[in-house]
């Protein structure tokens, strides 16, 4: 099993548990250059809010989009957008990535901005 397959296996296991609980998810995906976050409804078919370093408003404020500072900006933006839609409580879906570095920075910023998980 290669690195990507192992990550996807971890992600599938976590998502199955969140589906059983019927939780709204804060999903994170990272690439070497960008980081993406989406708040997905409990039914799994509706994206309630999204933010990423690809967006012009966020990327213009950053020097580089692949570091912890960028993840912090995305975490703050996703929390503000989710709260504006009436979502306070979410389950953090790290998509099989380690809770470290950029993923942890995004989660911390989202918590500081008012999301609860």
Curated annotation (Swiss-Prot):
Q: Which Pfam families match?
A: Ribosomal_L18p (PF00861)
* GO BP: any one term: translation
Keyword rRNA-binding in the entry? The reply is yes
Question: InterPro entries, per this entry?
Answer: Ribosomal_uL18_bac-type, Ribosomal_uL18_bac/euk
Give the Gene Ontology MF terms in alphabetical order. Answer: 5S rRNA binding; structural constituent of ribosome
Q: What keywords are assigned to this protein?
A: Ribonucleoprotein, Ribosomal protein, RNA-binding, rRNA-binding
Matches recorded under CDD domains: Ribosomal_L18_L5e
Instruction: Pull one GO CC term from this UniProt entry.
Output: cytosolic large ribosomal subunit
Q: Which domain of life is it from?
A: Bacteria
The question of whether Transport is a record keyword is answered with: no
Q: Which PANTHER family match?
A: 39S RIBOSOMAL PROTEIN L18, MITOCHONDRIAL, LARGE RIBOSOMAL SUBUNIT PROTEIN UL18M
The UniProt similarity line reads: Belongs to the universal ribosomal protein uL18 family.
Q: What is this protein's function?
A: This is one of the proteins that bind and probably mediate the attachment of the 5S RNA into the large ribosomal subunit, where it forms part of the central protuberance.
On assembly, the entry states: Part of the 50S ribosomal subunit; part of the 5S rRNA/L5/L18/L25 subcomplex. Contacts the 5S and 23S rRNAs.
Q: Name it.
A: Large ribosomal subunit protein uL18
Give the species. Aeromonas salmonicida (strain A449)
Quick one: which gene encodes this?
A: rplR
């Amino acid at each position: 099993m290669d690195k990507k397959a192992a990550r996807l296996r971890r992600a599938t296991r976590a998502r199955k548990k969140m589906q059983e609980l019927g939780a709204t998810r804060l999903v994170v995906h990272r690439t070497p250059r960008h980081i993406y976050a989406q708040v997905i409804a409990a039914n799994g078919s509706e994206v309630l809010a999204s933010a990423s370093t690809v967006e012009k408003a966020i990327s213009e404020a950053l020097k580089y989009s692949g570091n912890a500072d960028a993840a912090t900006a995305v975490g703050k933006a996703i929390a503000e957008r989710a709260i504006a839609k009436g979502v306070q409580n979410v389950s953090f879906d790290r998509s099989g990535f380690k809770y470290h570095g950029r993923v942890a920075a995004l989660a911390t910023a989202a918590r500081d901005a008012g999301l609860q998980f």
